[in-house]
Amino acid sequence: METVVSGIRPTGNLHLGNYFGAVQSFVKMQNEYNCLYFIADWHSLTTHPKPENIQSSAKTILAEYLACGIDPQKAPIYVQSDVKQVLELYLYLNMNAYLGELERVTSFKEKARKQPDNVNAGLLTYPSLMAADILVHKADKVPVGKDQEQNMEMARLFARRFNRIYNTEYFKEPESFHFNAKAVKVPGLDGSGKMGKSEGNAIYLCDDEATIKKKVMRAVTDAGPTMLNQVKPEPIENLFTLMQLVSTPDTYDYFNDQYNNMAIRYGDMKKQLAADINAFCAPIRERILEFQSNEELLTKVAREGAEAAAASAEKTIREVREIIGFRN
């Protein structure tokens, strides 16, 4: 069975975009692959989070993953910093990574522009740490978005370079796994672009009914169509896309017909959309609260996940040490 590895930075709650864009597919993949899902707390250090936020953020993501249906018996969930072998491989890969190629990585240049007062070595060597996360489990596939494709290419480069330097075929080159039709680009509520944490246009899986309604009722609209079957502008198309995800086909068809016949009342549509989003999120929200209140279970899941991940990583590290020439 092929191995799949995927990580998420603990930078806030999961939103509808995370769910339909990735987590929904993670739940299906756990039945088809040997999956390991981790919470990338080391990666989050590049932005210098407060110490008290690191652990609480990791527990939040863990509870939300469980609430969405990831089964830790099928797919271990672990916190990155609990698997120390990753750091050792990160060191070895950094010895074979060159300054020029790291400085040319697009994500590094973008982050350096966004935080000019905090251009740290962690930002520069982000591709090395991401490669270590993947290669330490000798992953076959890694689910990534387009924004991570260059970092995946770096991971393949580091695997090839290690093999060449030590005259071995030890590391396979991990493939990028794109969900394609299985993934859904969930639009934000601000009229353009996709839903995101930093954009402030997201509906979170843990949002209560009142919060969901408030956000949806504030969504950008226009004055309405001025001709029959008019092409929907992006803000309106975004609302219909959300409705397609959470509402019944009959509900979607009703409002779509209303739009095409120039009879749409956006207020009515938003109220229906808010109710349908809440109906979708409610059972997940309840499970999130249930898992968050069970500290003992979260600790157990994280510990067992770390044990499974460490066993996989230790095997790799012992073999890598031997290849390099170190004693185990």
Feature map (PLM): residue ranges:
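Short alpha-helical "patches" and their helix-cap loops
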Residues: 103-114, 143-151, 171-176, 253-264
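N-terminal Rossmann-like or analogous alpha/beta NTP/dinucleotide-binding catalytic cores
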Residues: 2-132, 285, 289
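Short helix-capping/linker segments at secondary-structure and domain boundaries
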Residues: 99-103, 136-143, 247-255, 285
